Amino acid sequence: MKRTMLYLSLLAVSCSVSAAKYPVLTESSPEKAGFNVERLNQMDRWISQQVDAGYPGVNLLIIKDNQIVYRKAWGAAKKYDGSVLMAQPVKATTGTLYDLASNTKMYATNFALQKLMSEGKLHPDDLIAKYISGFADSPNDTIKGKNTLRISDLLHHSGGFPADPQYPNKAVAGALYSQDKGQTLEMIKRTPLEYQPGSKHIYSDVDYMLLGFIVESVTGQPLDRYVEESIYRPLGLTHTVFNPLLKGFKPQQIAATELNGNTRDGVIHFPNIRTSTHWGQVHDEKAFYSMGGVSGHAGLFSNTGDIAVLMQTMLNGGGYGDVQLFSAETVKMFTTSSKEDATFGLGWRVNGNATMTPTFGTLASPQTYGHTGWTGTVTVIDPVNHMAIVMLSNKPHSPVADPQKNPNMFESGQLPIATYGWVVDQVYAALKQK
């Protein structure tokens, strides 16, 4: 009931408020923003050491009080060709595009849902079956409940779906195998629930694959076209896209990821698997093979400058400059912690307890929210300190440490920088020791 009343409130506000003038980002210096420059220099040196130790490339940008106060790039956008180190790596720049991985969930799907809900075209309590035809339990399903699933259940990751059904891998997916977008939706409908909906929170890509399909159902447009035309273009963002190689970008503008396709250095095999270095194509297997590069859970590419505008839009309460995407009430609803688990908002992860330290560090306010991405991306938005941090990297662009023991652990993932919270803490420490 409270959620419904909040929704009605935000809808009333969004209908009565015309495009307002919101703060836009300007450039400033760390000193003027109150940062201890020596502490930031120490962080700079440490990141350089991590790159020297094998971490491929990093971009970091800091916003404080509507100003970009720090922006820097380290390392390489591409330094391997297959398993061979390049004689002349492609350097990372502050304009390099990165595969956002699961940050796609926030800066594509959540932004779309927040906009559509502000416009009254969606409701958090709407049933999934309202938008996805044929979404229902199968007679042989052990756990029932698909007919009761709401949009908010998917946003809270409490819908009952498994974390990763691996649809494109026939040996793992079995009868749920799909490497075709239309067929993938049918396979998602057939995917059995693993727990009773609403009984707990289990982070699942399937939730956001479904949410992406819902955005397409409501708008009548492919997800990428809708967000690029209705969200990014009005904000003046030209470097935030799905399938960048199909939209005018060159590989040299993009950070490469896994060295030998999706094979984890030769130990993973399935039909049509890529075997050459990912450079401009989404790394995520479900997004690439099962969804054609455009999915609600992964597939978006961007750079720190564009992400900064999107984070500032959240700090502003839903708008940027003369553009209003959604209302402040919508932002509040989406970033409020779930009663069952303080670390889950509606899609956004919230700094609700110490389990989020690897993401938000130890110094961010409890109201801080953001997300991470498997490729080495993290976004941190702190409305209390009116600050935001984005770190983009290409963590999988390194050899797998031990393919037989753990094919998902890359050598770069064993370095301290792979725990984003350390970098976040250094930013906060520099602010507190001004």
Curated annotation (Swiss-Prot):
It catalyses: Preferential cleavage: (Ac)2-L-Lys-D-Ala-|-D-Ala. Also transpeptidation of peptidyl-alanyl moieties that are N-acyl substituents of D-alanine. It comes from the Bacteria. Keywords: Carboxypeptidase, Cell inner membrane, Cell membrane, Hydrolase, Membrane, Protease, Transmembrane, Transmembrane helix. SUPFAM superfamilies: beta-lactamase/transpeptidase-like. Disulfide bonds: none annotated. The chain crosses the membrane at residues 7-25. Its main location: membrane. Its EC number is 3.4.16.4. GO terms for cellular component: plasma membrane. It is a single-pass membrane protein. GO terms for biological process: proteolysis. It is found in: Cell inner membrane. One of its GO terms (molecular function) is serine-type D-Ala-D-Ala carboxypeptidase activity. HAMAP family: S12_YfeW. Belongs to the peptidase S12 family. YfeW subfamily. This is Putative D-alanyl-D-alanine carboxypeptidase. It comes from Escherichia coli O157:H7.
